[in-house]
Curated annotation (Swiss-Prot):
Belongs to the peptidase S54 family. Changing P189L: In TOC; likely pathogenic. Disulfide bonds: none annotated. It is linked to Tylosis with esophageal cancer: An autosomal dominant syndrome characterized by focal non-epidermolytic palmoplantar keratoderma, oral leukokeratosis, and a high lifetime risk of developing esophageal squamous cell carcinoma. This is Inactive rhomboid protein 2. The gene is RHBDF2. It is a multi-pass membrane protein. Interacts with EGF. Interacts (via cytoplasmic N-terminus) with FRMD8/iTAP; this interaction leads to mutual protein stabilization. Interacts with ADAM17/TACE.
Amino acid sequence: MASADKNGGSVSSVSSSRLQSRKPPNLSITIPPPEKETQAPGEQDSMLPEGFQNRRLKKSQPRTWAAHTTACPPSFLPKRKNPAYLKSVSLQEPRSRWQESSEKRPGFRRQASLSQSIRKGAAQWFGVSGDWEGQRQQWQRRSLHHCSMRYGRLKASCQRDLELPSQEAPSFQGTESPKPCKMPKIVDPLARGRAFRHPEEMDRPHAPHPPLTPGVLSLTSFTSVRSGYSHLPRRKRMSVAHMSLQAAAALLKGRSVLDATGQRCRVVKRSFAFPSFLEEDVVDGADTFDSSFFSKEEMSSMPDDVFESPPLSASYFRGIPHSASPVSPDGVQIPLKEYGRAPVPGPRRGKRIASKVKHFAFDRKKRHYGLGVVGNWLNRSYRRSISSTVQRQLESFDSHRPYFTYWLTFVHVIITLLVICTYGIAPVGFAQHVTTQLVLRNKGVYESVKYIQQENFWVGPSSIDLIHLGAKFSPCIRKDGQIEQLVLRERDLERDSGCCVQNDHSGCIQTQRKDCSETLATFVKWQDDTGPPMDKSDLGQKRTSGAVCHQDPRTCEEPASSGAHIWPDDITKWPICTEQARSNHTGFLHMDCEIKGRPCCIGTKGSCEITTREYCEFMHGYFHEEATLCSQVHCLDKVCGLLPFLNPEVPDQFYRLWLSLFLHAGVVHCLVSVVFQMTILRDLEKLAGWHRIAIIFILSGITGNLASAIFLPYRAEVGPAGSQFGLLACLFVELFQSWPLLERPWKAFLNLSAIVLFLFICGLLPWIDNIAHIFGFLSGLLLAFAFLPYITFGTSDKYRKRALILVSLLAFAGLFAALVLWLYIYPINWPWIEHLTCFPFTSRFCEKYELDQVLH
């Protein structure tokens, strides 16, 4: 046994020596004393605050024990009551390569599959996922803010929770108070290198000091159930326009301009905020009163040159009657003079600047759900009884930044300015503008010609220019049957035409026999016996279609009519001759004359006419110098502009459905859109975010343009009319979803319906596309039910939301598919629907509006 012990002892000594030899030289192990030994100095430590005890505990412990805590047993480690005061301040020694390699690697996790990720992302997008509670609360908070601004007053309970700062959850309505929130570190940009510091603060442990900044919530005030901080009005100076209006009003009334513009500057200037006290303000104790307001000495009026305008709460403080006094937690009224007095006056260093910085750091104007700009105009409000679950959802809402609104407004303004500078401005007004001028016509004489143009009351370019830029115009989107028939009739007439040569050798032009003078001109038309042969090798087959002025298969070298490429006996199928024979005299009457007229595309329906260049330019047409026949040009391709058609006979510019959303008919039209976007669109985007609003804006605009292309095919329309009514539909959906929250929901519904009805009646006037308004509103209504945030009022409401999302998306897909089929496959013609966009109040009220779905 002794030998065994001896051997065992020797083995243990050898192993310990080996371990000591392997111990890294930079490893130091220090075992701290037990916790009760460190807290033994006396009972006076127990009377100190918890943070102060932790600071003393931290100073009494060695500073090297936290460097290598892995070597200490867990039983010897002290229990951390407050981890914020037990952070190590010692520097770690550089670790060797052996220590770095010995660290444990994190474990591997199985990555979610693509289908699971897509399914989870879709559920979070529509707000039906299981872990979407926090996001849903944020949506609900934002929706309450929007409702309070747009749809009137809320219920009383919901309004009180809405006035809470974002750090306080509305669910804390009982006797328990939440834990104090940690105030973020705020850096004063005006401190010029001086840190915020208490005057008596030394480099020693101390208890947290009460805040010296007046008018701002302290750390302990965040534990209160009700705080008056959210009642502070926003600091806002008068704009230049406001001061100009006041100055103009003062001049009209005979007053001094300085008195009118300086009314707000008569108060005593201060760079700090007065203490705010409200009737419903309830705090936890008297310490908050002592640490949140000025002493009597600091309430005196002292001039300040830091800020030029009066502070935020100064004007708000003056509006409170002197009879109003705050109430302590015990229910005892505190006099006003004692309420604004601090027990211990301290130095003023850093107080006033800190109040400004903290106010702007915590102050964020939020958008209430269901209440927004329109709700503020219509004085809507929440009802008084709202459950705590709904209140928690409303409290957690934050406002998005309206990136899409600013981008869209910038694009609209820039494009409108570029269009005006490039294409100019058409005649302004509501009637027809007639221009008369003497123009050289086909017969070689000057004639009086009228050009009728529709005036544009939007102060912008003409309809032809808007079509060329990308306006909604059905003949450019798909093949139109009536325009195709019109082109076929013109080609039939051209097939029987001939060359009219003037006898005085003044020129020639392609025309009909009835339009050529029998005495002053010679009409050249091939007959069965006078026409040239089809091919030089077969002289028996003669041509009967022709002749064409300045074009003949016998003289054209490129493309040549020979072999397998013989030109057909139909002049409407002849190609453009790019190279003629180099000979001054061919011996053919229709070839040796000077041609006076060539094809000209006039109007917006693809109509072609062989005429002079002067007449074509006067009629704002497109003159084709290279062609001799109308069948050789494609007028619709030239009128539509943008990208050329893949097949010249088949229009395919379907991208006009969304391209026209960024165009405007004029400056006034653009200003109306900018005002709408900076009020309604901006307010909705703060609620739902740019991605959701962008989807609703674009899809509802495309749907409205698609319907307008079906029912008003020959009317060029630009602007986001369908998108704007889709956003108005979002207001209705938001009203329906926040119906249980509003105090008077029916009044809000009637007010909003009156606005939409008024806009619909305005759409009965000319030049306003009511078809796009109607279908944009329907599509926006369906999309808003699927994409807008939704406040749930229970488990059944959550399942109802899922069903509503599915039904809304299916209904929108069905509506969009039906419109596509009606546009491309089964065109419909409902003449009565024209009255929805221009009602004929008189016999000539909608004249020249180009509403007819039948071309003449």
